[in-house]
Design a protein with these regions (language model features):
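Sec-dependent signal peptide recognition
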Residues: 2-10
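C-terminal motif of bacterial Sec signal peptides marking the signal peptidase cleavage site
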Residues: 15-19
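Compositionally biased intrinsically disordered regions enriched in Thr/Gly
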Residues: 21-325
Length: 325
C-alpha cells in the first residue's frame, strides 16, 4: 500500500549498504495483562493499557542496533464474551506481526551500524533502528469498537516516520469491519467529502497537498482500504498518511464525515447522532460554513503525533523486555 511508502523511503539508506553483521534472534515473552478493569456502567466495552513489550537486537560488540517496543490495550466486555475474545485475539496478532516485521530489519540494522563505524562514528553515539507501536481506543460501545494504532519507525537518516492505521470491530461478533460493511453509498460520500476539502484547500494560500484530486484517483481510493479509516465519536474518518496526498512536512491528514451527513447511508447499527465534518491536519482544522466557504481554526490535535501523557495512561501490566547479544 502507498501508506507504507514512508517506511520504504526511510529504509533506502540501509538497504543500499553492502556490508552486514550478525546477531541472534530474540526470544519473545509477555506479561499477563491485568483484566480486573470493570466495563462501563452502560455495559459497553472497556479498555485498559496492557503489557509493555520490548525487544533489543545487539551487534557482536553488545551495541543495540534495533529496538522494537509496543504498548497494547486489553478489552474487557463480558456482555459479549465471544466478541471480546475475537477482538483481543486480533489485537494481540497486530502486536505480534509488528514485532515480527520489525525484526526482519535486523540485517539492515547491523549493516547500518557497521557502515556507521567505518565512517568514523563511535558506538556510544550510534542511534539504533527503532520501531514503536501504541494504540488508542476512539469509540467503544455495544455496536462498534474502533482503535487507532500509531507505528513509528526510524531506520537511519534525518528523521523517522509515523504511520497510523485503524481496526474497526463489530462489538457483537468481534468481526473486523470493512468499508463495505458500513453501507453501499458510504464510500462515495466520504471520498467526495475528502476531495471537496483537498481541492478547496488547494485554492488557498495553505495549499499543502501535492495537487487537486478526483474521487476515482488511486491515492484517494486507497483511503477506503481496511486499516485506513475508523469510526470516531464525530463520524467516519479517512486517514491520509504521510506522502500519500501531501509531503512529509504536512504530516498526516484526517477527513471526517459526520454521522449527520452519513444519515440514511451508514448502516443504522453503526451510526450515532451529530458529529462534525472537517479536515484536520498539523496546519489546523478546516470546515465549511453555512455558505459553503472554507474556514480554518487552530487545533491542538495533530494526527501525526503519537498519544502521550494524559492521552496514554501508564501501563497497568508489567514491562516485558527481551534482548539478544
Amino acid at each position: 500500500m502507498k501508506r507504507l511508502f514512508t517506511l520504504c523511503l526511510a529504509m533506502v539508506m540501509a538497504l543500499s549498504l553492502a556490508a552486514c553483521g550478525n546477531s541472534k534472534t530474540p526470544t519473545t515473552s509477555s506479561t499477563p495483562a491485568d483484566t480486573s478493569v470493570e466495563p462501563t456502567s452502560a455495559g459497553h466495552p472497556a479498555f485498559h493499557v496492557g503489557s509493555n513489550s520490548k525487544q533489543d537486537l545487539t551487534a557482536k560488540d553488545g551495541t543495540e542496533v534495533l529496538i522494537s517496543k509496543s504498548t497494547a490495550y486489553d478489552i474487557v466486555y463480558p456482555e459479549a464474551s465471544d466478541a471480546q475474545k475475537a477482538i483481543q485475539k486480533d489485537l494481540e496478532q497486530v502486536v505480534a506481526d509488528f514485532h515480527k516485521d520489525s525484526n526482519k530489519q535486523e540485517e539492515d540494522a547491523n549493516t547500518y551500524y557497521q557502515e556507521f563505524l567505518k565512517s568514523g562514528g563511535k558506538k556510544e553515539e550510534f542511534t539504533p533502528y527503532t520501531f514503536e507501536l501504541t494504540c488508542k481506543p476512539l469509540r467503544a460501545d455495544n455496536n462498534v469498537v474502533s482503535i487507532l494504532f500509531y507505528s513509528y519507525a526510524y531506520c537511519g537518516g534525518a528523521h523517522g516516520s509515523l504511520t497510523t492505521f485503524a481496526r474497526n470491530y463489530d462489538a457483537k461478533t468481534g468481526k473486523v469491519l470493512t468499508m463495505k460493511d458500513f453501507g453501499e453509498e458510504v464510500s462515495s460520500l466520504v471520498t467526495d467529502n475528502a476531495v471537496k476539502f483537498i481541492n478547496a484547500i488547494q485554492d488557498t494560500d495553505d495549499a499543502f497537498f501535492y495537487d487537486k484530486v478526483k474521487a476515482n484517483d488511486e491515492s484517494v481510493q486507497s483511503m477506503l482500504e481496511t486499516g485506513n479509516f475508523y469510526l470516531s465519536k464525530d463520524g467516519l474518518v479517512l486517514i491520509d498518511g504521510q506522502y500519500l496526498l501531501q509531503p512529509y512536512a504536512a504530516g498526516i491528514v484526517e477527513f471526517t464525515t459526520s454521522y449527520d451527513d452519513l444519515r440514511g447511508k451508514l448502516n443504522d447499527e453503526y451510526t450515532l447522532d451529530g458529529g462534525v465534518t472537517n479536515c484536520v491536519s498539523a496546519m489546523g482544522t478546516y470546515t465549511f460554513d453555512q455558505d459553503g466557504k472554507l474556514t480554518k481554526t487552530e487545533s491542538s490535535y495533530d494526527p501525526a503525533e503519537m498519544p502521550k501523557g494524559d492521552d496514554m495512561p501508564e501501563a497497568e501490566g508489567g514491562d516485558s523486555s527481551t534482548s539478544s547479544n
